[in-house]
Amino acid sequence: MEDVEVRFAHLLQPIRDLTKNWEVDVAAQLGEYLEELDQICISFDEGKTTMNFIEAALLIQGSACVYSKKVEYLYSLVYQALDFISGKRRAKQLSLVQEDGSKKTVNSETPCETENEFLSLDDFPDSRANVDLKNDQASSELLIIPLLPMALVAPDEVEKNSSPLYSCQGDILASRKDFRMNTCMPNPRGCFMLDPVGMCPVEPVVPVEPYPMSRSQKDPEDAEEQPMEVSRNGSPVPVPDISQEPDGPALSGGEEDAEDGAEPLEVALEPAEPRTSQQSAILPRRYMLRERQGAPEPASRLQETPDPWQSLDPFDSLESKVFQKGKPYSVPPGVEEAPGQKRKRKGATKLQDFHKWYLDAYAEHPDGRRARRKGPTFADMEVLYWKHVKEQLETLQKLRRRKINERWLPGAKQDLWPTEEDRLEESLEDLGVADDFLEPEEYVEEPAGVMPEEAADLDAEAMPESLRYEELVRRNVELFIATSQKFIQETELSQRIRDWEDTIQPLLQEQEQHVPFDIHIYGDQLASRFPQLNEWCPFSELVAGQPAFEVCRSMLASLQLANDYTVEITQQPGLEAAVDTMSLRLLTHQRAHTRFQTYAAPSMAQP
């Protein structure tokens, strides 16, 4: 047992180190497993009958499928039986109810025996606790509800926010307007009614002030707004207000009584007597609709903190911000021409020198030293400024190079470049002030007595650091990349991967050099090696002297020929005795596809 645990330690405990996975020889273990399977044999009748694992697995799978089908069929039968019993009980119950109703019309005193009903799982009776309603009470009035009650109309968001419903912890759960119990009238019998049926649908119009101050307006939290109710005959009726007294309408002086905390009197709901159509036609329809007051806005609202990551609505109107006037900068005329201007401005006849304009404008004031060091502060002038500075530096380098040559060769090249010398002298006069505002670190004076061979080094030193920094960085990066490619630190895992690549690469190249495999060509070659028809020939003799991959290809071709009935395959009986005893017999030289082309069915043959 210990040998097995040591052998399969990598399977029992997962390897966390990735490099140790390369130490597991998967091919050797698979080979040993196949050898063990080859040695295991389950046979019956002294080796004559062997167990076929594939057939056994298919048998188990088929048995499971058949059993599952039978269980499913039994399940459906049970449900059909339950539906049949429930339907039969329901039909019997309906017939009993109809007979019971007919008996009540003839003789209401005869009791009706109730039979135990079949209890269905999905048919639960309605719970009517604390409700005493008579089902046999026939109403003489015609119940018509032409309008939707206001209690069923969904309130607005403003009304919901005006009366929030808080939990014990102080969290806002919902609005008190969401629950119908808060807007319904309790009936003396125990149920909640949406309409005040106990009140008369026609009430005399009471002259009141246009906007009386009632308790509901004083304290909106205690007395919420009651919506307009609709009676059963279709006419709107006023809802009883807690501030009104039963004797008469509320007077204007009732405000003080309401503020003093007088308890409201309960209004007794008396059942209205049924009226005939003639009486209702004679009475004048004097009623008024109660005005629905707007929801009062809360005094203090929580200031919502805006979400900075919330996406903006493209159709929303943004807040108008106050225009802040900035500091404008005007470009001198003639420096830059603005395209697309219809109005032609009269510019300067001659282009003004930028360097002279800059010195006159900024270098002569008292704080000129600071301005000269920092340069211009205009973003539009940056390009022109640095371009001009670059031209000045190039001119200074050429002038220094010329002076060095004249110092070491005084008489050789005096008359060679008069035009360039004159031009350099003129530029030197113009650049006399340029040395003032340039940084002292940008150029270095050459010492006297410098050799001509060192002129290039002096030019490199005289070049400003800002201009050669980019070139220096590029050279350093290229040098670093070139050196880092030579000294790459190889880890243990990369070294093993490289060894594996060195091992597998020759095998892959060898396989790429093989001839492409065509099973029909190999089948023709195998058929041509048979000496004659109907003669058994061992497979080892047919593939003698061929490499391993050619033997495998010939094996596949022989199986294809056996499938086409071109050859016949046989072996010796027994499991161990049948190893390497495969023999083939050629049945026909004609290929399968040619036989199928010339094949004629017996039914199509002419008599």
From Swiss-Prot:
GO BP: any one term: mitotic chromosome condensation
Name under which the protein is recorded: Condensin-2 complex subunit H2
UniProt keyword annotations, A-Z: Disease variant, DNA condensation, Nucleus, Phosphoprotein
Modification Phosphoserine occurs at: S95, S231, S235, S252, S494
Function: Regulatory subunit of the condensin-2 complex, a complex that seems to provide chromosomes with an additional level of organization and rigidity and in establishing mitotic chromosome architecture. May promote the resolution of double-strand DNA catenanes (intertwines) between sister chromatids. Condensin-mediated compaction likely increases tension in catenated sister chromatids, providing directionality for type II topoisomerase-mediated strand exchanges toward chromatid decatenation. Required for decatenation of chromatin bridges at anaphase.
PANTHER family per record: CONDENSIN-2 COMPLEX SUBUNIT H2 (PTHR14324:SF3)
Disease / disorder: Defects in Ncaph2 are the cause of the nessy phenotype which is characterized by a specific defect in T-cell development. Nessy thymuses are smaller, with corticomedullary junctions less well defined, and cortical cells sparser than in wild-type. The thymocyte defect is typified by an increased proportion of CD4-CD8- DN T-cell progenitors. Only thymocyte differentiation is affected in Nessy mice and not cell differentiation.
Subcellular location: Nucleus
Subunit organization: Component of the condensin-2 complex, which contains the SMC2 and SMC4 heterodimer, and three non SMC subunits, NCAPG2, NCAPH2 and NCAPD3 that probably regulate the complex.
Taxonomic path: Eukaryota, Metazoa, Chordata, Craniata, Vertebrata
Region (Disordered): 211-312, 325-347
GO CC aspect terms: cell junction; chromosome; condensed chromosome; condensed nuclear chromosome; condensin complex; intercellular bridge; nucleoplasm; nucleus
Protein family: Belongs to the CND2 H2 (condensin-2 subunit 2) family.
Residue numbers carrying Phosphothreonine: T19
Xref: InterPro entries: CNDH2_C (IPR031737), H2_M (IPR031719), H2_N (IPR009378), Ncaph2 (IPR031739)
Keyword field contains Amino-acid biosynthesis: no
Composition-biased stretches (Acidic residues): 254-263
The species this protein was found in: Mus musculus
